[in-house]
């Protein structure tokens, strides 16, 4: 009855998964009896079923059963029922919470295999490249056995390699690179340059880390550097003059701002009348960054200094965030604080949050050891339910009560004492810290006690997996920041179970209970014994920021030893729940702001995709001309306040901006004859005529059929430039929205209204700027060409105004090419001739000192002088071979005709040859053109073209020999090219 009750407590998804699991298990013996070939061939069968109209759910049971059997055969591991349950939840587009050590990697194989059968690509996202490589290599063996391809997307790969990886059936990638590739794909100028092939299904490993912990951090591609080191140094110098009474810090939000005393000091320092006047916004911005860098952010907590550079530290994982930097000048403020070289500030070119990127996938699922506490956020933001998958074996780890102390010093002393006690027994212990500085403090204290240990923090990131894997050995003491080594199992060494398993010791509480549970979960995998305990102090950040610290510390601050009583534990739990809610609200705020940008980004990216696909921009350009005219006629120096037109200003403006290439004079078309109500339509027609009749016709003449690529480039680059300016403006607008007070309006409303206005300006301005660029397209200039005849008779063309040194280079490089072709021909000729003779059944059978004996066909022999050039020997031998043609069958003649050999009738061949070449041939001679038979063999343009290699000739037998008409046609094409060099 208890199990039945638990069954109905589960979600509808999990209940469905149990029913499907039963059906999958019933297929076990059927697929288990198949040969490897038959099992692997099920992939083809499934694909045919899908092609015939069936859906994934129709083949789900069979596909899961096949994947399970393949995993057993290839990896030697049979997926447990709970792993199949987890896989089914993943296929449903939900989150599977599976405890550490329950085999999430194996659980992912069936759903990934099933979804890859659609042929639209499946992406498996991981938190680091080590895990991506490991899982791709291990699981890839199963997928390869089943006939699917696997790719690994890495940061350092070039675009071609990335494209190949994404085109695989299944692609493994670190999550950040997926987002950056998406942004880069929407900055290309050709659809063929894109690397991703659509966002179909993504399975996210450690989904809470990516979609919750990193949700607030946007992905940013930067460029357009601005170098103003003096301003950062000045702001840093000012902040260092401040004392605590000059500014206010909000402990909860970590926000900071100057108070009245600080503002007075700023006015005096920078020589200002009022710091917050609009013209001082840049100074305010740099002061805010300097305040945050110096008074809020801590070295070895939020960042470290490594090799003279600022390296960001992920606050949830403790890992270095490689390749990432703070934006909007904060990175430069930190560099000024630390006395480092100040790098140029960059401009945001493209940005997206993880929240909005992963919501682009048609289907999204994830797996983690801890997600249930964040289920509401997964539902609200990603429409994903969290299903807790039961463990394969009962969990027997002991989670002890927290030990709470008054001060950090007392806490650290208690930690060292506990480590000494546990270490004496030989029990391995993993000490989890949230900050690099804490790990180094404890490490120093252990060194003083002579306790050998290993430290894993952001500074030893590359050794992460190796260090964590060894944490289960006897006597091992490991210090690790937060979730370092996540995804790597800690295997207990033989004998450790008897010692009590792995001891997890947490040194403070995280901002989310979920993170604490992840640390606990490193112990007690697959029914192993283990223990976990947290050591806390009232001076920890959690108490300082999210409790009534003064009251709590006043009541318990003088306590010696661990603080007892339920109240203090209740305060701790309440503080964690409070900060969880606070962080959730922050992520929702980030998402709400980014949703405004997302709608605009979707419109721009959709427009880019259209522009990448079309090959005729006429309709698009017509619409842009209409927008451009609207903008021109909105300028107040053209349309005066009284609605009168300043025709002279208008004509000058048009001539200055739209006539640089055509030199068209807008003053000669009677603009001044059109009143304001007719002027708009008149200008539109005039600009259309100028562009399509003049500019575009020259483009076609100069660039040929690819003229539209020039138009595409101009339109795209203009759109990108305006969009990038817009993003940069929006970023500053978002950061300043909360600082501006508007009556009866909230910051989000202000941001939305301003962002919408600025987007409308972007659309109009990009159209206008594109028209200006199109009308001034340098490719539309009239160019006169002249030609030069090369030594091989071909012609090359170049612009008449080309510099002489460029012309000389062009001619020289072409002559080098011709010389190289001739040399290659000479080197290949002997080999090629002998191969051709062999095809005609002519071969050398004996070679003496002076003569060579050649066999022609099956019955004729001829002796030729050895010193005779090979091409002359060829002429004679081929001619001799013709004597036998009359004796050939029709079938043999047809065969020769198929080889493009001309059958000729020759009378008294031996007598003719003997009379004309008595010195070189004992009894034969010839009288025809020496190249006549070469042309029979090699084609009518034999003397003009390079001999192809014998390997190529084998594959192109019918194209090696051309007739005289081919030569004439080739010469005609060369002449035509000289007239139209750009085609």
Swiss-Prot record:
GO biological process assignments: intracellular protein transmembrane transport; protein import; protein targeting; protein transport by the Sec complex
UniProt function note: Part of the Sec protein translocase complex. Interacts with the SecYEG preprotein conducting channel. Has a central role in coupling the hydrolysis of ATP to the transfer of proteins into and across the cell membrane, serving as an ATP-driven molecular motor driving the stepwise translocation of polypeptide chains across the membrane.
Protein name: Protein translocase subunit SecA
Alphabetical list of InterPro entries matching this protein: Helicase_ATP-bd (IPR014001), Helicase_C-like (IPR001650), P-loop_NTPase (IPR027417), SecA (IPR000185), SecA_CS (IPR020937), SecA_DEAD (IPR011115), SecA_motor_DEAD (IPR014018), SecA_preprotein_X-link_dom (IPR011130)
GO MF term (any one): protein-exporting ATPase activity
Catalytic activity from the UniProt record: ATP + H2O + cellular proteinSide 1 = ADP + phosphate + cellular proteinSide 2
Enzyme Commission code: 7.4.2.8
UniProt lineage: Bacteria, Bacillati, Mycoplasmatota, Mycoplasmoidales, Metamycoplasmataceae
SUPFAM superfamilies reported for this sequence: Helical scaffold and wing domains of SecA, P-loop containing nucleoside triphosphate hydrolases, Pre-protein crosslinking domain of SecA
Annotated signal sequence range: none
């Amino acid at each position: 009855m208890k199990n039945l009750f638990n069954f109905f407590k589960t979600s509808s998804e999990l209940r469905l998964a149990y029913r499907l699991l039963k059906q999958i298990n019933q297929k076990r013996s059927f697929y288990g009896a198949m040969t490897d070939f038959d099992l692997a061939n099920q992939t083809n069968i499934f694909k045919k079923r899908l092609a015939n109209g069936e859906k994934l759910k129709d083949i789900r049971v069979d596909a899961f059963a096949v994947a399970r059997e393949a995993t057993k055969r290839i990896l030697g591991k049979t997926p447990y029922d709970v792993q199949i349950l987890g896989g089914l939840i993943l296929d449903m587009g939900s989150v599977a919470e599976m405890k550490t050590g329950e085999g999430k990697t194996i659980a992912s194989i069936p759903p990934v295999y099933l979804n890859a059968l659609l042929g639209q690509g499946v992406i498996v996202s991981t938190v680091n490249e080590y895990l991506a490589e490991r899982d791709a290599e291990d699981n890839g063996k199963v997928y390869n056995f089943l006939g699917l391809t696997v790719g690994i997307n890495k940061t350092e790969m070039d675009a071609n390699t990335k494209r190949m990886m994404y085109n695989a059936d299944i692609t493994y990638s670190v999550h950040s690179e997926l987002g950056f590739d998406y942004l880069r794909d929407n900055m290309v100028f050709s659809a063929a340059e894109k690397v991703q092939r659509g966002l179909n299904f993504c399975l996210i490993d450690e989904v809470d880390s990516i979609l919750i912990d990193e949700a607030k951090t946007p992905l940013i591609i930067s460029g357009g550097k601005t170098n103003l080191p003096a301003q950062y140094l000045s702001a840093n110098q000012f902040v260092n003059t401040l004392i605590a009474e000059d500014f206010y810090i909000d402990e909860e939000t970590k926000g900071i701002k100057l108070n009245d005393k600080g503002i007075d000091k700023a006015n005096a320092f920078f020589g200002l009348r009022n710091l917050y006047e609009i013209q001082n916004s840049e100074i305010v911005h740099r002061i805010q960054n300097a305040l945050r860098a110096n008074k809020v952010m801590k070295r070895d907590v939020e960042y470290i200094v490594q090799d003279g550079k600022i390296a960001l530290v992920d606050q949830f994982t403790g890992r270095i965030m490689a390749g990432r930097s703070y934006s909007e000048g904060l990175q430069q403020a930190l560099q000024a604080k630390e006395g480092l070289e100040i790098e140029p500030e960059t401009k945001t070119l493209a940005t997206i949050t993880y929240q909005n990127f992963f919501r682009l996938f048609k289907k999204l699922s994830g797996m983690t050891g801890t997600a249930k506490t964040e289920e509401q956020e997964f539902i609200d933001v990603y429409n994903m339910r969290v299903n807790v998958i039961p463990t394969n074996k009962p969990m027997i780890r002991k989670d002890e009560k927290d030990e709470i102390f008054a001060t950090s010093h007392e806490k650290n002393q208690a930690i060292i004492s506990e480590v000494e006690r546990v270490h004496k027994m030989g029990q391995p212990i993993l000490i989890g810290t949230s900050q690099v500085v804490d790990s180094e403090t404890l490490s120093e204290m252990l060194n003083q006690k002579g306790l050998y240990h290993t430290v894993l923090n952001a500074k030893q990131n590359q050794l992460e997996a190796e260090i964590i894997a060894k944490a289960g050995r006897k006597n091992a003491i490991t210090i690790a920041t937060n979730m370092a080594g996540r995804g790597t199992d800690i295997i207990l060494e033989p004998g450790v179970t008897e010692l009590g398993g792995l001891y997890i010791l947490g040194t403070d509480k995280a901002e989310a209970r979920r993170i604490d549970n992840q640390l606990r979960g490193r112990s007690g995998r697959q029914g192993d014994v283990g223990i976990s305990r947290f050591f806390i102090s009232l001076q920890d950040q959690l108490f300082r920021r999210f409790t009534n610290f003064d009251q709590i510390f006043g009541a318990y601050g003088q306590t010696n030893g661990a603080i007892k009583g339920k109240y203090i534990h209740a305060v701790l739990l309440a503080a964690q729940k409070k900060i969880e809610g606070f962080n959730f609200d922050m992520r929702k705020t980030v998402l709400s702001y980014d949703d405004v940008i997302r709608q605009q980004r979707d419109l721009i990216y959709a427009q880019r995709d259209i522009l990448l696909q079309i090959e005729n921009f006429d309709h698009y350009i017509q619409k842009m001309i209409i927008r451009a005219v609207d903008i021109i006629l909105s300028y107040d120096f053209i349309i005066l306040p009284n609605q009168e037109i300043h025709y002279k200003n208008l004509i000058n403006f048009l001539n200055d901006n739209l006539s640089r290439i055509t030199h068209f004079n807008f003053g000669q078309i009677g603009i001044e004859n059109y009143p304001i109500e007719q002027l708009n339509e008149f200008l539109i027609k005039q600009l259309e005529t100028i562009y399509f009749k003049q500019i575009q016709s020259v483009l076609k003449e100069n660039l040929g059929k690819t003229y539209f690529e020039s138009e595409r480039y101009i339109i795209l680059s203009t759109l990108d430039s305006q969009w990038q300016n817009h993003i940069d403006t929006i970023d500053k607008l978002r950061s300043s929205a909360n600082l501006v007070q508007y009556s009866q309006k909230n910051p989000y409303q202000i941001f939305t209204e301003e962002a919408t206005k600025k987007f409308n300006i972007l659309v109009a301005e990009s159209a206008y700027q594109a028209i200006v660029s199109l009308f001034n397209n340098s490719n539309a200039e009239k160019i006169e060409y002249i030609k030069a005849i090369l030594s091989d008779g071909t012609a090359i063309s170049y612009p008449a105004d080309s510099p002489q040194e460029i012309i000389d280079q062009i001619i020289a490089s072409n002559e080098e090419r011709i010389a190289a072709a001739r040399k290659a021909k000479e080197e290949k000729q002997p080999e090629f001739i002998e191969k051709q003779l062999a095809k005609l059944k002519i071969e050398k059978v004996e070679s003496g000192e002076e003569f060579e004996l050649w066999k022609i066909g099956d019955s004729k022999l001829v002796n030729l002088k050895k010193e005779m050039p090979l091409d002359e020997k060829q002429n004679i031998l081929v001619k001799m071979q013709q004597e036998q043609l009359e004796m050939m069958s029709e079938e043999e003649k047809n065969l020769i005709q198929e080889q493009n050999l001309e059958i000729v009738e020759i009378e008294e061949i031996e007598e003719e040859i003997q009379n004309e070449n008595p010195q070189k041939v004992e009894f034969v001679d010839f009288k025809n053109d020496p190249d006549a038979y070469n042309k029979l063999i090699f084609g009518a343009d034999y003397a003009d073209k390079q001999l192809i290699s014998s390997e190529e000739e084998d594959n192109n037998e019918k194209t090696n020999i051309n007739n005289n008409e081919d030569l004439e046609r080739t010469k005609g094409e060369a002449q035509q090219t000289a007239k139209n060099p750009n085609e």
